[in-house]
Amino acid sequence: MQFEVKDLINKIKKDGLEEAERISNDIIFKAKKEAEEIVARAEEAVGALKAKSEKEINDYKRHALEASRQAIRDLIIGVEKNLKSLFENTLKDNVAEVFSDNDFLSELIIKITDSWIKEEKLVIQLNESDFSGLEQILRLKLGNKLKEGIEIKPFKGISKGFKIQKKNTGLQYDFSVETIADILFDYLNPRFKEVIKVV
């Protein structure tokens, strides 16, 4: 009987050890499986986070580059506008300077009226500030033509220069600083654009 008890104890020990080993192996297997799943999920999350970060970095770079390009375009357009405005103002100043010379203006008016007086009566409109000085010069140089149908009048709407109106047709020709400068600017503008063309 003693052997039977010993055998029974040995058997219980053996069965207990086997069961404990089996349970231990199951626990280790499940732990490894769970660890592998956790690592796989972590790697997947890291990959997704890395892809998202790379996309955000690329988007930021693209937006920054687009913003830089737009800023450069705006700067170029601003510089072109400023240069154009400066050129236009300088042109107007130069025309105004030329038109400040009463001798030049009187010669110009006489040349224009010489060809038009044959067709119809004319009204020469001068700016008010230059009227008295220019009227005297024109009266001397035009002489009898004033009796033939040329009338000289002051006009508030002209800063420098003059306007000539054909009485019969009502047509008016504007030789003011602003109009002459605008015509010259329109003529010179394509060349000017070519000179300042940056991009």
UniProtKB/Swiss-Prot annotation:
GO molecular function list: ATP binding; proton-transporting ATP synthase activity, rotational mechanism; proton-transporting ATPase activity, rotational mechanism
Keyword set includes Transmembrane helix: no
Any one GO CC term of the record: proton-transporting two-sector ATPase complex, catalytic domain
Keywords associated with the record: ATP synthesis, Hydrogen ion transport, Ion transport, Transport
Gene Ontology biological-process entries: proton motive force-driven plasma membrane ATP synthesis
InterPro entries associated with the record: ATPase_V1_Esu
Function text: Produces ATP from ADP in the presence of a proton gradient across the membrane.
Entry's family note: Belongs to the V-ATPase E subunit family.
NCBIfam families: PRK01558.1
Protein name in the entry: V-type ATP synthase subunit E
Species of origin: Borrelia garinii subsp. bavariensis (strain ATCC BAA-2496 / DSM 23469 / PBi) (Borreliella bavariensis)
